[in-house]
């Protein structure tokens, strides 16, 4: 009977587990954004100079329109540490005075009746956790929206195929046009509401995942 209960518990745990959605290379959400094509009426004057193809010596070539490309320089570094100490002490004492009857101390085999009880408990827990991450590189992204206040919403991804797996970098966020460098780049630290994802798919990425049984032992469901 115990075997069947254990087997049923394992089946229920496996059934409750969820599988995360795997990223795909051609995700429509990260598809390139193209600017709207507006036909320009150009008068045929016979001149080799055309206003539609001219650019000023003082014009700004930095990205500022929907569909323009901007390069995000990834300079991310995070470090966190956490420690916790917890100590619980509990004690109780109970004593009963000698029992008297008729002015005499009641005893058993000459030993007076005297009850006493003492209990104490001491629990102490200590935990430390350290984590640090760094990400350096660059990725080009599209401007997908120009807000009314001039801020730009960007989005882009990069996929790299290596051996039996793929690695990808994705970035989304909001930037100010004033923070764009003259070479049309911007530091990732200047991206507001940034969502930067660096991961991979394939055999190497799967080998770094924790199995469902190990996840159970490290979850809150494990009583110990």
From Swiss-Prot:
Signal sequence extent: 1-15
Subunit (UniProt): The basal body constitutes a major portion of the flagellar organelle and consists of four rings (L,P,S, and M) mounted on a central rod.
The protein's name: Flagellar L-ring protein
Matching InterPro entries: Flag_Lring (IPR000527)
Lipid anchor positions (S-diacylglycerol cysteine): 16
A UniProt-annotated Pfam family: FlgH
High-level lineage: Bacteria, Pseudomonadati, Pseudomonadota, Gammaproteobacteria, Alteromonadales
Location(s) in or outside the cell: Cell outer membrane; Bacterial flagellum basal body
One annotated GO molecular function: cytoskeletal motor activity
Annotated keywords: Bacterial flagellum, Cell outer membrane, Lipoprotein, Membrane, Palmitate, Signal
Function of the protein: Assembles around the rod to form the L-ring and probably protects the motor/basal body from shearing forces during rotation.
GO cellular component: bacterial-type flagellum basal body, distal rod, L ring; cell outer membrane
Membrane topology: Lipid-anchor
Biological process according to GO: bacterial-type flagellum-dependent cell motility
Family according to the record: Belongs to the FlgH family.
Lipidation sites (N-palmitoyl cysteine): 16
Organism: Shewanella frigidimarina (strain NCIMB 400)
């Amino acid at each position: 009977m115990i075997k069947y209960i254990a087997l049923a518990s394992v089946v229920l745990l496996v059934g409750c587990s969820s599988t995360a959605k795997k990223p795909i290379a051609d995700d429509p959400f990260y598809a390139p954004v193209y600017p709207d094509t507006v036909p320009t009426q150009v008068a045929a004057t016979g001149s080799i100079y055309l206003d539609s193809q001219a650019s000023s010596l003082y014009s700004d070539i930095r990205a500022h329109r929907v569909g323009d490309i901007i390069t995000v320089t990834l300079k991310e570094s995070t470090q966190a540490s956490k420690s916790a100490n917890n100590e619980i002490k509990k004690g109780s004492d109970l004593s009963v005075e000698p029992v008297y009857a008729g002015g005499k101390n009641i005893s058993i085999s000459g030993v007076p009746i005297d009850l006493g009880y003492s209990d104490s408990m001491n629990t102490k827990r200590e935990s430390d956790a350290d984590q640090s991450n760094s990400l350096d590189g660059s990725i080009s992204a599209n401007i997908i929206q120009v807000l009314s206040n001039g801020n730009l919403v960007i989005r882009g991804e990069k996929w790299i195929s290596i051996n039996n797996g793929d690695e990808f970098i994705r970035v989304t966020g909001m930037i100010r046009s004033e923070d764009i460098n003259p070479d049309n780049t911007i530091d990732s630290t200047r991206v507001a509401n940034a969502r930067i994802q660096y991961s991979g798919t394939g055999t190497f990425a799967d080998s770094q995942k924790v199995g469902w049984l190990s996840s159970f032992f490290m979850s809150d469901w494990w009583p110990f």
